């Protein structure tokens, strides 16, 4: 996964909230198993509908961020999907979005995707449980996703219109949606547009322009607001709309649609908020990693101070530590939460998370220095680490700090294949890796800062 930075000359004083949120939306795409740029596509589609409807500048701004952040809570139900359906959560989510609205299509999808690796009796039992408890399961999964997404949006200081837009993404026009079974105009307009934009992009990506239009028509007046479907049909007559949707410069085109009346430049405090918010998205992927990013960042900050790193640079270290595992959003929970050793294929998938971290954080120039620090936390002093096999002085001091903090927290926390180790056991293991995986000075700083 490789993306070119869109702001090579950006500084903390010139980057806007729209630019940063647009870049981080790629992390949400990979969590949902969607192609890179899905949230940007949805923003392009939905923003054009908003303009066609003549929305006010404030309503267009709220819609814009609802579209980019519609999947902000998506990591919170990944582990549960994997557990319930005994399936790759990312592949399951991706496939489910292309399923028709009828009950027969849903049953066929569940039967074909659930517990595929299990024995026949086990598979029948799992499928039977899901079909018997389908309504309860669907409510649980969507409430988790919507509640988490809305909560994180509030921590990013977005207004209620945005958090409510995210919360009600899965409501349907006919009242059959979730989490609150709202009907018609009771559903926030931003939610109605976001759902339409999501369906349009998924089917356009999957099967082309005509398939997207046909699917929206099929879902009109059941899933989707018929007025919005008509608005989309009008927008879709403009060939430039489709050219823009497929443009390799879609990031810049979507950025140009961002309302400028209340454009917010990002200062250091807000960048901290964004890093903290996406740290929560990362940690929600698995209950085994709950709080991991925040603990690693806190410990890295203390060690950085004790090792004489200047406060301004230490702030970047803290952000890098918060986001070091953002690439794990692109790894299935069937791998992350496996209760036994990973096989060779699974190790390849797991190791890819470091490259994903580099790709996501490297999209924006203001994060360019931080990206390799975060992405290299599995490199080893002896050169046997990944993703690049760096060694010795090729590994920056900030990365070495994150590495030892990550190692400490991983060993001292519960994992799917073992329980948490005691502090003495953890330190003994880390000490045994000094000089091969772990920097000796960083180990001593860790020991003194616990």
Which residues does each PLM region occupy?
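Metal-dependent catalytic cores of enzymes that make or break cyclic nucleotides
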Residues: 3-450
